[in-house]
Amino acid sequence: MEPRKNVTDFVLLGFTQNPKEQKVLFVMFLLFYILTMVGNLLIVVTVTVSETLGSPMSFFLAGLTFIDIIYSSSISPRLISDLFFGNNSISFQSFMAQLFIEHLFGGSEVFLLLVMAYDRYVAICKPLHYLVIMRQWVCVLLLVVSWVGGFLQSVFQLSIIYGLPFCGPNVIDHFFCDMYPLLKLACTDTHVIGLLVVANGGLSCTIAFLLLLISYGVILHSLKKLSQKGRQKAHSTCSSHITVVVFFFVPCIFMCARPARTFSIDKSVSVFYTVITPMLNPLIYTLRNSEMTSAMKKL
């Protein structure tokens, strides 16, 4: 269905209109993006070429870093370009495309983090059956399911807003394409649509986060049965994953699991989960994973 609209493009206000401040932010976000790409690509390459990293956890970690690469690349390059050239205009179709990619890979990451928690549960609570349960085809299937889940979530989000009429104004007080600021510009009642957006994004994030907390509660309880060496190894892998989960889900829940309104703090929170978290994930996993660190040194 063709969208009923008069607006053909939107203007993203970004962080500031001051040219000097824009240049400072340009350097900062360019550095963040370079670090994100280098760190995540290093993990993908290490897992791919290393003979010692053949575990399901390493496979899922490579999948997570690949998602972070695409997710970050859907937002940061345009942000960096806008800060450098000062051209904050984006076409309606490009806005929708970025929105689709954000939700596709953001949703996929939610499901993949659940899969990784299940992998840790099997490894720690059912160690004798781990390789039987987490066979290669099972790992591939779980990864595909994560992507399909993100795809369906993204299709649903886009389908409920694409046909909205946008008659003007076309100025969005944000630095990237986000759902709630867009709903404010629709020249129709968006109350029901806002509830659907919250249910699809916020509710799914909240449920996933609660499931993760429960799973890690079970895992931590099971650590008592392990030897001291086993507890240390399990604690190392679990603590890194829990850190990533908290960094990703807490800001996401704040942004999505609330009424469809915008707040002054939204930009700062959005920077954390769209820019900072993808950059920190490789650092968190490598610092807490001795096997990954050793494999990187052999490259």
UniProtKB/Swiss-Prot annotation:
It comes from the Eukaryota. InterPro entries: GPCR_Rhodpsn, GPCR_Rhodpsn_7TM, Olfact_rcpt, Olfactory_Receptors. Glycans are attached at N6, N87. The keyword Transmembrane helix applies. The chain crosses the membrane at residues 24-47, 56-77, 99-118, 138-156, 194-217, 234-256, 268-287. PROSITE patterns: G_PROTEIN_RECEP_F1_1, G_PROTEIN_RECEP_F1_2. GO terms for cellular component: plasma membrane. One of its GO terms (molecular function) is olfactory receptor activity. Residues 1-23, 78-98, 157-193, 257-267 are extracellular. Residues 48-55, 119-137, 218-233, 288-299 are cytoplasmic. It is found in: Cell membrane. Keywords: Cell membrane, G-protein coupled receptor, Glycoprotein, Membrane, Olfaction, Receptor, Sensory transduction, Transducer, Transmembrane, Transmembrane helix. It is a multi-pass membrane protein. Pfam families: 7tm_4 (PF13853). Gene3D superfamilies: Rhodopsin 7-helix transmembrane proteins (1.20.1070.10). Odorant receptor. Belongs to the G-protein coupled receptor 1 family. This is Putative olfactory receptor 4A4. It comes from Homo sapiens (Human).
